[in-house]
Amino acid sequence: MSLDWLRTPVASRADPHEILLPVRTRYIVATLLSALALNLFALPGVLQSIRPDFIALTLIYWVVYHPRRVGFLPAWFLGLVMDVADGSLLGQHALAYAVLMYLAILLHRRIVMFGMRHQIAHVAAILIASQVIMLGVRLMSGAEFPGVLYFGPSLLGAALWPLLFNVIRVPLRPRSDPDAV
């Protein structure tokens, strides 16, 4: 099985005749609410501790590929919702998502030009930076260091980046015309 698709830039892999449909605000909201539902869905034991942050991944996607459509306010609000849902220190996720958004905005032009392998590395770095912020807040509030496995969800999230990339784009691709020659 060839992994050449990991090396070539996304822009050069796309069909030159493929033009994605315009993104509607309700689709962005639907993807963010779906990500919130995936974050809140209860999983048994070990799976709960390695679940990636789907909100963070979805925010990264929208900021990288449509930087003018999603801003800091939705990220901050979703962070507060996650803080309440997790029972964590209020503002912890919100601050982490704000930093995540800043890094994604800062790197979005660079990420778009890279192949999927390099995109995965950038997404992993952004997710780990976000988790470091949350860990710092926890440590300052008196919690103990959870160990290096704490960063496992970021690595798993980065590994899921190609899947998320393709799943979000499915409705944005135009339907094939049955009358086309």
Question: What does each model-found stretch correspond to?
Answer:
Residues M1-V181:
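Terminal, non-globular segments
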